């Protein structure tokens, strides 16, 4: 089914937690991903969101929409610290409870539980130990891979793990790195191809298939402060 067949309103997750409503900017981000997924067959997305604007809730709603519309059966959510994995599980454990979310570091001791879960939360470090991601999963095990703090997880060894998985990729970050904006790539590739390659490897927008400086959806700190219905109460 189209991703947009699963309609999104502010009440989308209320049945799991009556005190939680989606804000309009979260609904807009969810719908822009669905529009590009359905209409443009896009499979890479970058969501720029200021700190404190509800990234985890947005991710839970994203995952729920992919699972309920049958556009994903298994989802990997990558964070860069175990504390974040635990915090994420607190929210996922409520909204995604029907899908048996697990923390990879704990669940890998029980392979059946790990392989049977629809939602796996993992630190990039735990996936990288002894290249576990290659030994325990196939490239197509996860239909959806979401990267929290995406500007960090595309560097060095971490990049290998993220690129290994072939599912739809969504990156979230408050601080995307733009190394290709206002760069004449045609000129640079002739003058210094290695410099261009270095910029491409470090550019968050490029990694997630977006034009330089243009994420799939943006709700930065300026938007948050100006928004009368936003998360910041001044």
Stretches found by the model and what they are:
Residues 63-64, 71, 105-109, 130-135, ...:
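A generic local structural motif
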Residues 78, 92, 214-217:
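Anion-binding and metal-coordination hotspots
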Residues 50-52, 80-82, 150, 174-175:
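An acidic- and aromatic-residue-enriched active-site/binding cleft used to recognize and process polar
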Residues 1-74, 83, 87-98, 116-119, ...:
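ATP-dependent helicase/translocase motor core
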